[in-house]
Regions:
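Alpha-helical cap/lid subdomain in secreted, periplasmic
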Residues: 5, 100-241
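A generic structural signal for short, solvent-exposed coil/turn residues
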Residues: 38, 73-75, 85, 148-150, ...
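Short, mixed-charge, low-aromatic patches
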Residues: 20-32, 55-66, 95-102, 185-195
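Conserved SGNH/GDSL esterase-like catalytic core that processes O-acyl groups on lipids
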Residues: 43-47, 53-141
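Compositionally biased, intrinsically disordered/low-complexity regions enriched for serine, proline
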Residues: 36-38, 65, 95, 159, ...
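N-terminal secretory targeting modules
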Residues: 1-49, 53-62, 72-78, 110-111, ...
Length: 241
């Protein structure tokens, strides 16, 4: 009987610990769980395509404060905003974690959005994911083209990726998560060029965040709640002019 009681106590402890860990991961945008909902008939569908910055890595009270959720609040009930952000993903197909390799990519196509908000490229700054400026631009154009192949031709907004910052004790050219600020600048310029060539509106999140390191969590890479709110405001302002 004593052994059974000890076993029950251990099970309760293990369950409680697991629940605590899960809650921490979930509410800080670290779980990888996607937020999904079904659009109502007549709603304008907005797809937010991106990486961990779109997903909301490190956001406190993540379910209510990641940028696509905040964008939904700003846009109102006439719109349905769906996040297709996945942590660690990159534009280039030869990267360590290409976006096209995910079911989220297929789901973002199937969503048949009226509006695409595309913000990706931070993970392409990693040394192992960088194949040169032309290679990145070609990969970007190819990926964007995937969203124009259906009967519906969505309005596509290109966001430059946010700036990234060195932590106080960092050395060399890499930030945390192995991102390279100098290459983030290069990618931002490539995105601007691509937007001009394609005739897509550009939302310059890179310029918006460059002078605002206080908008980032301690890793210097992921926007905090204030940064997510600033991104949502910029995106909504671009759509509703």
């Amino acid at each position: 009987m004593k052994i059974i009681k000890i076993g029950i106590i251990l099970l309760i402890f293990a369950f409680s610990l697991s629940l605590l860990i899960f809650s921490y991961l979930y509410f800080n945008g670290l779980s990888g769980i996607a937020q999904t909902s079904t659009p109502e008939p007549g709603q304008i569908k907005v797809a937010c395509i991106g990486d961990s910055i779109t997903y909301g890595h490190g956001i406190k009270n993540w379910p209510k404060n990641n940028y696509p959720v905040l964008l939904q609040e700003l846009m109102g009930d006439s719109y349905h905003v769906q996040s297709f952000g996945v942590s660690g993903r990159a534009v280039h197909d030869n990267s360590d974690q290409p976006y096209r390799a995910l079911p989220h990519y297929e789901e973002s196509i199937a969503y048949d959005a009226d509006i695409i908000i595309f913000m990706m490229g931070s993970n392409d700054t990693k040394p192992e994911n960088w194949f040169g400026e032309e290679a990145f631009k070609t990969a970007l154009l190819d990926l964007l083209d995937d969203y124009t192949q259906g009967e519906k031709k969505p309005a596509i907004y290109l966001c430059t990726t946010p700036a990234c910052f060195f932590m106080e004790d960092s050395e060399g050219e890499l930030t945390s998560h192995d991102l390279r600020p100098a290459y983030a600048d290069i990618i931002a310029e490539i995105v601007r060029q691509a937007a001009e060539e394609l005739g897509y509106p550009v939302i310059d999140i890179h310029a918006l965040t460059t002078e605002n390191p206080q908008w980032f969590v301690k890793d210097g890479v992921h926007p905090n709640n204030e940064g997510a709110a600033a991104i949502a405001q910029a995106v909504s302002g671009a759509i509703i002019q």
